[in-house]
UniProtKB/Swiss-Prot annotation:
InterPro entries: PPIase_dom_sf, PPIase_FKBP_dom, Trig_fac, Trigger_fac_C, Trigger_fac_C_sf, Trigger_fac_ribosome-bd_bac, Trigger_fac_ribosome-bd_sf, Trigger_fact/SurA_dom_sf. GO terms for biological process: 'de novo' cotranslational protein folding; cell division; chaperone-mediated protein folding; protein transport; protein unfolding. Involved in protein export. Acts as a chaperone by maintaining the newly synthesized protein in an open conformation. Functions as a peptidyl-prolyl cis-trans isomerase. This is Trigger factor. It comes from Burkholderia cenocepacia (strain ATCC BAA-245 / DSM 16553 / LMG 16656 / NCTC 13227 / J2315 / CF5610). It comes from the Bacteria. Belongs to the FKBP-type PPIase family. Tig subfamily. PANTHER family: TRIGGER FACTOR CHAPERONE AND PEPTIDYL-PROLYL CIS/TRANS ISOMERASE (PTHR30560), TRIGGER FACTOR-LIKE PROTEIN TIG, CHLOROPLASTIC (PTHR30560:SF3). Residues 172-257 form the PPIase FKBP-type domain. Its EC number is 5.2.1.8. GO terms for cellular component: cytoplasm. The gene is tig. GO terms for molecular function: peptidyl-prolyl cis-trans isomerase activity; protein folding chaperone; ribosome binding. It is found in: Cytoplasm. It catalyses: [protein]-peptidylproline (omega=180) = [protein]-peptidylproline (omega=0).
Length: 448
C-alpha cells in the first residue's frame, strides 16, 4: 500500500506508520526470552527465573523499546521509498484511533528545502589588497620593542641612569602609587591599594585617575573626584562619584631596546643580520595580511550568496545548531576556568539569529558545491596543510599532526571547500579591488 505523505506547510510533513501487532508481539516475546537468560531475581539462580515472571516485570519496558525500534525502522523505510530528505529528527505520536490488529503512529518531520541560488553575476564583493612596505615593518619593530621594554627608576645611576630623580611622571612611565577612595566618606571594596603599579597612557586605569597621576613627583599626592561610568563592571560603584587621594611612590622610565644584532637574535635570527630580520618580518606580515584579506572577502562572499539565494530554513536544523552553539559557549567558559561551566544556564534563544544564518549558509554552500563540483581535492588539502605548517619551527611535524587526526583533517577540508566556493564566486561576481593599510585591514578583520 502506498504511503500517504501529508503536506503541513512549506517544509513540514506528516506520515502515518502502521505496525502489525502480531509482528510487534513476536519481537517482544523474542526479547523477553533473551532477557530471561541473564535476569536475576531473589530466590532464583541466574537464567532460571520463570518466563512468566520475567514478562510480568519487564514487558512494559521491552514493549516500549520494541515500538521505538520498529517505528524508527519503518520511518526509515518509508523515507527511502518516498525519497524524503528528512531534516532533523522526526517526532512520533500515537494516533487517537487505533486499529485492533495494528499500532498506528503519526510521524511529523521537516524536509530539506529547495535552494535557489540567484545570478552570481549580480553579486557585489569588495576585495581588499594590502602592500607591506618599510612603514609596516618599522611599525611592527616598534611594537616588538615595546613588548621588550625595561623600566628603570628615575635618577638611577649607571648605563640606564637619567639623572631625573625630581622628574614628574609622564605618559609612558611606569608609576607605583598608593591610593584611597571613598564614596560619601565611606571606603568601598577595591577602592584602596598600596604599591599599585601601572603604565601611564596605556588606558588600564580610568582617565580621571591617570590624569591625576600625571605630573606628580615621588612623595607628592593629589586628591580628586572620579565618577564611575554607568556601565562600570563594579556594580556597587557604577554611576557614583568617589573622592580619591593618590600618592606617588615610584616613577620608572621606559627603556626600549636598540634595533641591533642582539635584538635580531631575540627574534630568532641566529646571525643577528638586520636585513634578514626585516625580510622575515615582511614575510610574516604578508602571510598575516593574506589570511586577513581572505577572511574578510570570504565573509563578503557568504553575505552575497545569502542575499541572492532563496530558501526556507528547517526549524529542526536551527534548533540543533542552537544547541551546538550553547555547548560551544559552555566549553569556552570551561576553558576560561568558570566553575560548573558544563551546566551553565545559557538560553538557546540567544543564538537563534546566528544559528539560522549558519544553517542557511550551510544549505546554500552544499547546493553550490554539489552543482559546480567544488569539493576539496586531496592535493588541495595537502597544499593548505603545508602552507599552514610553514609558520612553525618544525613544518613536517605539523603536517604529521594534521594527518594523524581525521577531525583536524576534516576541518582543513571544510576550509578548502570554502576557499573553492570563494574563488568560484569571485570568478563570476562584480569584484572591486580596494587598497587598504595593514592597520585598517587588521581593524576590519577584527570586526568581521
Amino acid at each position: 500500500m502506498a504511503n500517504v505523505v501529508e503536506n503541513l506547510g512549506k517544509l513540514e510533513r506528516r506520515v502515518t506508520i502502521s505496525l502489525p501487532k502480531d509482528t510487534v508481539q513476536k519481537e517482544i516475546d523474542a526479547r523477553i526470552q533473551k532477557l530471561a537468560k541473564n535476569v536475576r531475581m531473589p530466590g532464583f539462580r541466574p537464567g532460571k527465573v520463570p518466563l512468566k515472571m520475567v514478562a510480568q516485570q519487564y514487558s512494559g519496558q521491552v514493549e516500549a523499546e520494541v515500538l521505538s525500534d520498529k517505528i524508527g525502522q519503518e520511518f526509515f523505510t518509508i523515507s527511502r521509498a518516498e525519497n524524503l530528505r528528512v531534516a532533523g529528527q522526526p517526532s512520533f505520536e500515537p494516533k487517537q484511533e487505533q486499529a485492533e490488529d495494528a499500532y498506528a503512529f503519526d510521524a511529523t518531520f521537516e524536509v530539506y528545502p529547495e535552494v535557489k541560488i540567484g545570478d552570481l553575476a549580480t553579486a557585489e564583493v569588495e576585495r581588499s589588497t594590502t602592500t607591506i612596505g618599510d612603514a609596516e615593518i618599522d611599525r611592527t619593530l616598534d611594537i616588538l620593542r615595546k613588548q621588550r621594554v625595561h623600566f628603570h627608576a628615575r635618577g638611577e645611576a649607571g648605563e640606564h641612569g637619567d639623572g631625573g630623580a625630581d622628574t614628574a611622571a609622564k605618559n609612558g612611565d611606569r608609576v607605583t602609587v598608593d591610593f584611597v577612595g571613598k564614596i560619601d566618606d565611606v571606603a568601598f571594596q577595591g577602592g584602596t591599594a598600596e604599591d599599585f603599579p601601572f603604565v601611564l597612557g596605556e588606558g588600564r586605569m580610568l582617565p580621571e585617575f591617570e590624569t591625576a597621576a600625571l605630573g606628580l613627583k615621588v612623595g607628592e599626592q593629589r586628591t580628586f573626584d572620579l565618577k564611575f561610568p554607568d556601565d562600570y563592571h563594579g556594580k556597587d560603584v557604577a554611576g557614583k562619584t568617589a573622592q580619591f587621594t593618590v600618592t606617588m611612590k615610584k616613577i620608572e622610565w621606559p627603556h626600549l631596546p636598540e634595533i641591533d644584532a642582539e635584538f635580531a637574535k631575540s627574534l630568532g635570527i641566529e646571525d643577528g643580520d638586520l636585513t634578514k630580520m626585516r625580510a622575515e618580518i615582511k614575510e610574516n606580515l604578508e602571510r598575516e595580511a593574506k589570511r586577513r584579506t581572505q577572511s574578510i572577502v570570504k565573509n563578503q562572499v557568504m553575505d552575497a550568496l545569502l542575499k541572492i539565494s532563496e530558501l526556507d530554513v528547517p526549524k529542526a536544523l536551527i534548533e540543533q545548531d542552537q544547541q551546538r552553539l550553547v555547548e560551544m559557549a559552555r566549553q569556552d567558559l570551561a576553558q576560561r576556568g568558570v566553575p560548573n561551566a558544563k551546566d551553565a544556564p545559557i538560553p538557546a534563544e540567544m543564538f537563534a539569529e546566528q544559528a539560522e544564518r549558519r544553517v542557511k549558509l550551510g544549505l546554500v554552500l552544499a547546493e553550490l558545491v554539489k552543482a559546480n563540483g567544488l569539493e576539496a581535492k586531496p592535493e588541495q588539502i595537502r597544499a593548505e596543510v603545508d602552507e599552514f605548517a610553514k609558520s612553525y619551527e618544525d613544518p613536517k611535524e605539523v603536517v604529521r599532526w594534521y594527518y594523524s587526526n581525521q577531525q583536524r583533517l576534516a576541518e582543513m577540508e571544510a576550509f578548502v571547500v570554502e576557499s573553492n566556493v570563494v574563488d568560484f564566486v569571485l570568478g563570476k561576481a562584480k569584484v572591486t579591488d580596494k587598497e587598504v593599510s595593514f592597520e585598517a585591514l587588521a581593524s576590519a578583520s577584527a570586526q568581521a
